[in-house]
Amino acid sequence: HKTNAYVISNGVNDSFVPPSQPPHNDKFTIVCSGRYSREKAQQQLLKAVAISKHKDEIRVILAGDGPRGSYLKALANRFDIDATFAFFSRDQMVKTLQNADLYVNTAIIEIEAIACMEAICCGAVPVICNSPRSATRFFAIGDNSLYEQYDIEDLASKIDYWFEHPEEKAERSKEYGATRRSFSQRECMEKMEAM
């Protein structure tokens, strides 16, 4: 007996919207959000920033909490990275993503990628881990939005690329913008109701 199968996202809350003005930060601000855990693999970002050509001009915000917090903080200190570790409310997360110059998704295991969808909805250009066990990689547009899993040099080169190409980053944000509507909770609920 055959049936029609549909994959419909849970969607992103409608408060995640692009800022009225692009961010103007004193440092290039990279946001990475998610539980501090092995499968989120945020150490990849810290190690990549440590070898970036622009390390001293970069600020990292690791939004989340979890069992690997102490390890990640120690790593940031060891590499002398300007890093903030915090758990944000929804309103704070929206503001943080709206002010991001880049969003990095380091997860090696991820099913739906709501955090990356939230970043895209806030206008951020993502750089995503190309893990075979993560659905997030399918959001990538273009070569400079994916890096190979655990390849720190590859991630650092993608960070440096976007740091050095702000005009292209603005254009890429517009390309991602075309996908935002499909992530809306309202849109996803309408699809479910239409089934």
Describe the residue ranges of each PLM region:
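Conserved acidic donor-binding segment of nucleotide-sugar-dependent glycosyltransferases
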Residues: 141-152, 161-166
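Carbohydrate-associated surface elements
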Residues: 11
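Conserved donor-binding/catalytic core segment of Leloir-type glycosyltransferases
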Residues: 23-40, 46-49, 61
